[in-house]
From Swiss-Prot:
Role noted for this protein: Phosphoserine phosphatase that mediates dephosphorylation of phosphoserine in the serine biosynthesis pathway. Also able to dephosphorylate other substrates such as phospho-L(or D)-threonine, with lower activity. Shows phosphoserine:homoserine phosphotransferase activity by transferring the phosphoryl group to homoserine using phosphoserine as the phosphoryl group donor.
Enzyme Commission numbers on file: 3.1.3.3
Organism of this sequence: Pseudomonas aeruginosa (strain ATCC 15692 / DSM 22644 / CIP 104116 / JCM 14847 / LMG 12228 / 1C / PRS 101 / PAO1)
Requisite cofactors: Mg(2+)
Name recorded for this polypeptide: Phosphoserine phosphatase ThrH
Length: 205
């Protein structure tokens, strides 16, 4: 029994915060876990900036509604779901993800939750647990699943290390250099091949 675990942003959909930064012209919101590996530090910075500019959840959702999955992502998810159980492990928030998950056919998503006040202001967030992607992989392994994981960033590397097989996809050069133990690919066709290679079953493209 095998489970495919995928990161969401940068792997299947654009980086939501980068798209939001471009739309609002606030460059400081372009920082991601690629730049600031400590997610808690990154989120506190984002919330402070949102507050300084008076931006509410509705403003962010408006931008997300204009985003589309990366080219080829929908077909890739369909291909993967025919061959594996698929779970998206993401550091996004349920409040952000709905429009994009709909376009991907609503695969299972494990992520975090925002805290919103009565005026639609983002006042905080609830992380599901510490190192949630790795903890999810540990849980799947305890159920005797073989886990193959793919991600693009620092915050994916503990998940990739914990999985039976880890794959870097669309990762920047600094992450590829720092984690040479993982195969690094940049197209969905190559990612399919890595999943087939990592599988304990005899599967075809």
């Amino acid at each position: 029994m095998e489970i495919a675990c995928l990161d969401l942003e940068g792997v299947l959909v654009p980086e939501i915060w980068i798209a939001f930064a471009e739309k609002t012209g606030i460059d400081a919101l372009k920082a991601t876990t690629r730049d600031i590996p400590d997610y808690d530090v990154l989120m506190k910075q984002r919330l402070r900036i949102l507050d300084e500019h008076g931006l509410k959840l509705g403003d962010i959702q408006e931008v997300i509604a204009t985003l589309k999955p990366l080219e080829g992502a929908v077909e890739f998810v369909d291909w993967l779901r025919e061959r594996f159980q698929v779970v998206i492990l993401s550091d996004t928030f349920y409040e952000f993800s709905q429009p994009l998950m709909r376009q991907l056919g609503f695969p299972t998503l494990l992520c975090h939750k925002l805290e919103i006040d009565d005026s639609d202001r983002v006042v905080g967030y609830q992380l599901r647990q510490k190192d949630p992607k790795r903890q999810s992989v540990i849980a799947f392994k305890s159920l005797y699943y073989r886990v193959i994981a793919a991600g693009d960033s620092y915050n994916d590397t503990t998940m990739l290390s914990e999985a039976h097989a880890g794959i870097l996809f669309h990762a920047p050069e600094n992450v590829i250099r720092e984690f040479p133990q993982f195969p690094a690919v940049h197209t969905y066709e190559d990612l399919k091949r890595e999943f087939l290679k990592a599988s304990s079953r005899s599967l075809s493209l």
